[in-house]
Amino acid sequence: DARFCATTASMCGVEKAGFEQDAAAMDKAIQLDVMLHAYMFTQSGIPVIYSGDEIGQVNDYTYKNDPTKAHDSRYIHRGAMRWDLAANADDADTVEGKIFQRLSELEKIRRSEKVFMTNADMWTVETYDSSVLCIGRYYEGEKMFGLFNFSEYDKTAWINETDGMYKNMLTGEVRKAAGVDIP
């Protein structure tokens, strides 16, 4: 079986960090999970959040107990929605709440900013680091850069855009788009 199957949260380390009760690893796993969804939100088209991804639902191994499914690893991320965990979505102190609230914020930004229109221009920007991706979007006078750190270490994106000041859509910070630190 050459497939790569798992929930987003499990691929990002949420499952492992929870099993090991490692708070620092959990914070990094949540950051990676949210970053991957942010990357998805910068793409054109309709972003699709798979059932359970909005709360960081981890792999469901119970498929192995069903002889009709045990041979197909895709069932690992097709488990039933964990409504008991979804009940934690409003609690910012839980994994589910941290992920749900941050994805909700990304969704709100995507809906409200015209730079995410389907017919916006989209391109990549050189970051001088193969583990850092920068995606630019432009629509009707608005420009946005999305920075994505695929490294396990904090990085600085050397994108050196010199055409003005930019506002971080998540924090509201206004700054130049040059030498941007990203976790």
Which ranges hold each PLM region?
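Active-site and adjacent substrate-binding regions of carbohydrate-active enzymes
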Residues: 1-183
